[in-house]
């Protein structure tokens, strides 16, 4: 099984990666190039850290090639100034749509978008 996860350095994403690795899956985590939280990711030969932000998700498709499931947990701009910014949120929506397109290009049978971002 091949799994793609955005937001993998967050609480939910990192635990989801660990769960799938325990089940023997090959896990591709798409991580912002400027992320300072890579230490939360497990060390595992089946874990592939792909430097990729929401603005260039489609660039990762050629590296991953194919996947069974795509879990989209990333969202930028969760601080007070950015959460109220239409420009930042428009980028998030565009990135989410690109995640759906990437999942389709990777022939994923399942796509899940989840997170706590709407609670803020």
What are these regions (language model features)?
Residues 51-91:
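NAD(P)H-binding glycine-rich loop region in Rossmannoid oxidoreductase-like domains
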């Amino acid at each position: 099984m091949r799994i793609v996860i955005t937001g993998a350095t967050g609480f939910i994403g990192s635990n989801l990666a660990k769960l799938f690795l325990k089940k023997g899956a090959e896990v591709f985590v798409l991580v912002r190039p400027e992320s300072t939280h890579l230490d939360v990711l497990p060390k595992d030969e089946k874990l592939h850290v792909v430097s990729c932000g929401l603005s260039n998700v489609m660039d990762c498709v050629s590296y991953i090639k194919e996947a069974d499931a795509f879990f989209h947990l990333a969202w930028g701009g969760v601080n007070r100034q950015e959460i109220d910014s239409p420009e930042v949120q428009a980028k998030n929506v565009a990135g989410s749509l690109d995640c759906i397109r990437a999942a389709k290009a990777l022939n994923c049978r399942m796509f899940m978008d989840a997170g706590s971002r709407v609670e803020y």
